């Protein structure tokens, strides 16, 4: 059985474009993001650009002010840290719901662990972010609960992880071993798996 390709709306595509610009450093903290310029660049109307910017504002990545337009927020460690207790709670629930499924089959997690070993070896921060987030997304997806996955995605995990590394330098030398240990814990049906996942996520939080 083949999986149907995911079709992203125009708004989602624009949001991803802006997110990539923030993560890559195209737009620096405090820098203005011009709605009209993005619309021209992507050859779209300003309406979906405005909708995408609203979503990013709800994630606290940008801020708007009357007569000043939209700017990238100057995020602090405290700002970034706030999402981690919520994320840890969600992933602990996901670990409990997914425990039996992942005990039998961890194939969705294993490629990310292998990729993390390679990213660690190369000190590839971009790869570390991509596969750390990919690992945790597959963990949450394995819970089989669409509300849980939607809520987790709504936290902006990937962009906050990337920004904490880019702006705050919260990079670790090794990401792979901790994630391999979680795979081993799922395989052995560790009764404390939810606590292990929660502690792991909280341990990744930037410190104010």
PLM region spans:
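Mobile beta-alpha loop/short-helix "lid" or hinge segments that flank ligand
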Residues: 58-63, 155-157, 172-173
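Generic detection of well-ordered alpha-helical segments
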Residues: 8, 12, 16, 20, ...
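Amphipathic alpha-helical segments enriched in hydrophobic/aromatic residues interleaved with Lys/Arg
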Residues: 106-123
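Short linear motifs at protein or domain termini
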Residues: 1-100, 205-208
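Hydrophobic, amphipathic alpha-helical faces that serve as interaction scaffolds
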Residues: 86-99, 133-170
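Hydrophobic packing residues in well-ordered alpha-helices of helical domains and bundles
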Residues: 83, 106-109, 128, 132, ...
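C-terminal all-alpha effector/ligand-binding and dimerization domain
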Residues: 113, 117, 164-208
